Amino acid sequence: MATLGCAPKDDGEGKDEGGSDRGDGDSKPKGKKEVEPHTRREADERAMRIPIPEVLQQRLADDCYYINRRRRLVRLPCQTNVGAILECYVRHFSASVLALGDRRPQPQRAAPERSVGLCREMADGLRITFDHALPLVLLYPQEQAQYEMVTSSTFFFPTEERASDAGRSQEAPWPGPSPPQPSESQAVAGPAAPKRRRAEAEATRAPRRSTRHSTHCHWQAEDRASPQAKRSVPKLFPHLQKTPVHSAAPSPIALTPGKEGSAMFAGFEGTTEEINEILSWKLVPDNYPPGHQPPPPSYIYGAQHLLRLFVKLPEILGKMSFSEKNLKALLKHLDLFLRFLAEYQADFFLESAYVSACEAHYSSKNPRTLC
């Protein structure tokens, strides 16, 4: 993980071997066979460059500093996990395409970079890749023990309790552990002092996120008098910056299609069915993952670790086979997603996400307190 902040290096060895083969006149046919794979690989690596915006590069540097120099950890599970970020982006992208007048009954006229279907495939591919790559290449050594703890079965609720919670939160596209619904007096009079302190700190941070500007993603739960309820539904929804829809006092869009969600799309070019389809789309089914299995990393980790993936992504994609057309479309969608992260980086990359190892350990031992 020492190279997380650095882009993968060019395969210089392959280039040297190719040069030596060309100079070997006694084995010209063999040299030709060896040169072409190296040449293709070097061309693929050049094509796989995924430029990371400067503001996100600074976030990577900050991440490295907090973990390695200040010995801090990201508090887990994150309030805004990778699945939530990807789902928010797909809705943001879909609404943007709809606002520009692209109708899905005529997909042949839409450019690949404006294809909602390709955007969804990209998001799902990132989720799957993140789940596989995180324990292998996305963790610093200091984070390994935390990973083993948060992915253990003891970190999450028993199956019976999770099943009952799932019935109360059918909307949620990720199975974040939902606490019982306490009364306000019970929430205030909880016995754990550290839990109260974190709840108060979260309540003081919330206005800073929601008042930054009127056109960005918000968590759906806005009841600041009940921090526990706010944590139990960490949903993001798009308030588009380049659309004619504006609200003096932004309110969250309901996940299920309804009057509230449709009202937020007033002025969009599109049918009610199109708008409802955007609002109701989910990255994964409600019953994923099964209740007897711990959630995957994309349900636990957040923007900090997702951004690390983009440092390793060129190397990962370089080992896959893509046609030139598909690769070009994929890279375009990845670039658009990075722009989205850069635009809302102040909301996704919070300094308060980094806590001392002791506090991170406490959070891991008390999964009811979602970050």
From Swiss-Prot:
Residues 44-367 form the MRG domain. Residues 183-193 have a biased composition (Low complexity). It comes from the Eukaryota. Disulfide bonds: none annotated. Residues 1-47, 160-230 are annotated as: Disordered. Keywords: Chromatin regulator, Nucleus, Transcription, Transcription regulation. Residues 8-47 have a biased composition (Basic and acidic residues). Its main location: nucleus. GO terms for cellular component: nucleus. One of its GO terms (biological process) is chromatin organization. It holds the Pfam family MRG. It is found in: Nucleus. Residues 206-216 have a biased composition (Basic residues). Gene3D superfamilies: MRG domain. Probable non-catalytic component of the MSL histone acetyltransferase complex, a multiprotein complex that mediates the majority of histone H4 acetylation at 'Lys-16' (H4K16ac), an epigenetic mark that prevents chromatin compaction. This is MSL complex subunit 3B. It comes from Mus musculus.
